[in-house]
Amino acid sequence: MEEKPKYKRILLKLSGEAFAGEQGYGIDPAFLEYISHEIKNVYDLGVQVAIVIGGGNIFRGFQGKEIGVDRATADYMGMLATVINALALQSALENHVNIPTRVLSAIEMRQVAEPYIRRRAIRHLEKGRIVIFAGGTGNPFFSTDTAAALRAAEIGAEVLIKATKVGGIYDKDPEKYPDAVLIKEISYLEVINMGLKVMDHTALTLCKENEIPIIVLNVKEKGNLRRAVLGEEVGSVVRG
């Protein structure tokens, strides 16, 4: 029996930290190969896949203070880090799993990426290409989570999948507290009121206003991404 995906178009948010693998910094080739195959398993269902990547494996905005850089400049440095990750993932998707991939950057740099144009992004998706959005929103003071929510709304994605290293949303940090409880389903407002670190308020509000459900899952568990897209119960869902 042919498996039917629940969603036709998805926005996948990958953190920069995931790219670092076990070493904690830089880009781990093993993760690139792994995530390429995980994405291909979703792509092969006929799903249109757009991706937003963080840059935390290379540079994080709050590091700016330590080196005497102001917040806006530090954020721009972080945006450039996302472009490095986007190019690495583009190469992996094209070389490991042979999927045509386009990088669209919110900060113009025509030699390495196409400029972000909403209609062009949608056209690429319709033509069966994977689209990677780099450069965050193109503005300082906005996180890549907010960029993910914004792009999801702009392209009409039916779901935002936040790929993390934990099994979903917990009532407290599962890495610190072994008795942390997984929350299967929760509303946007509850996430904000409980102070859960799923996404920042700007990103959550964008998803709420545009009725985009958020699935938080452990991307390191093989097949999770595909199961989520098929509508199976994986991780946690934020909606309503």
UniProtKB/Swiss-Prot annotation:
It is found in: Cytoplasm. Residues 21-26 are annotated as: Involved in allosteric activation by GTP. GO terms for molecular function: ATP binding; UMP kinase activity. Pathway: Pyrimidine metabolism; CTP biosynthesis via de novo pathway; UDP from UMP (UMPK route): step 1/1. InterPro entries: AceGlu_kinase-like_sf (IPR036393), Asp/Glu/Uridylate_kinase (IPR001048), Uridylate_kinase (IPR011817), Uridylate_kinase_bac (IPR015963). ATP binds at residues 13-16, 56, 60, 164, 170, 173. GO terms for cellular component: cytoplasm. It is an enzyme of class 2 (transferase). It catalyses: UMP + ATP = UDP + ADP. One of its GO terms (biological process) is UDP biosynthetic process. Its main location: cytoplasm. Belongs to the UMP kinase family. This is Uridylate kinase. The lineage of its organism: Bacteria, Pseudomonadati, Aquificota, Aquificia, Aquificales.
